[in-house]
Curated annotation (Swiss-Prot):
Disordered: region residues: 207-288
Superkingdom of the source species: Viruses
Biological process annotations from GO: transport of virus in host, cell to cell
Organism: Ourmia melon virus (isolate Melon/Iran/VE9) (OuMV)
Official protein name in the record: Putative movement protein
Amino acid sequence: MGDNALDLATASSTPIPMPNTGQLVISPQDIGYSDPPKLRGRLKLEFVHDISLDANVEDPIALIPHGIWSIFKSKLAQMRCPKGYITYDKVILSWKPHVATGLARGQIAVVDTRVNHTSIEDLMHKALWKTAPVDLGCTYTIQGTVPYCLPFHPKEGGDVKSDLESQNPIRGIVYITDSRYQEAARHGALTMTLKLSIGTMPTDALTGPRATLSQPHLRDNLRSRSQRISRPPIGITQRPRRSLAEPPLEKEEEQESTLSSEASGSEQGLIIPVQGPSTSSRSRRVRG
């Protein structure tokens, strides 16, 4: 990560590197599966979740608002299905700071809080994906997916339902790695845009964070060299669809991707590495 990270201090004078699409890999992990019921229907939801972080920035924030769970339960009841599967088709995190540049550096990440962890630092180390340390005084937009679906019981008393609805384990986090003025770093707005699917058949999100050029002038400047960006990421392979009822485990293998960011109040765009999941491939059968 360190060799590929862009030094923000010299970003204005450093040529913008092209993303290495050969490292754009987030693959589903062979952790477990269950036999799904016959497919009867599928519901797609897309919504925006705005959070103003005036304090406790480092606390993970649930991506799914509490009120959305009632929609899941009612739709599954209409489909007369005993179990549904939630898929995070798209996760977009947008960070808009309320402080000047240069006051703090940190990482923006998506985590699964069900993994065994002893601290926020440990949880960040096992994040599904995260940025390299960036200047939290700049504006960033990061897009990715969760590479496995979550089983969900619509009825009261279902243990998986209780875990998912009460813990709401897939969360976004802004983690401060270095700050000259700690309280100043705890101010900003995190906008979470989600595209979810709920259905009676388990699915996997097979693509991870992609390189996106959000600024038109930056896209024009790189057009002559951007043929690789429009191609599917190298290394992503189709696998049998399965339900992963448990979070990733603990193998320390890091994969990198890229994200787009834009400096607040500046015309200079930045492309910053994103680390993929660190997981284990141990599988376990989960009864449906």
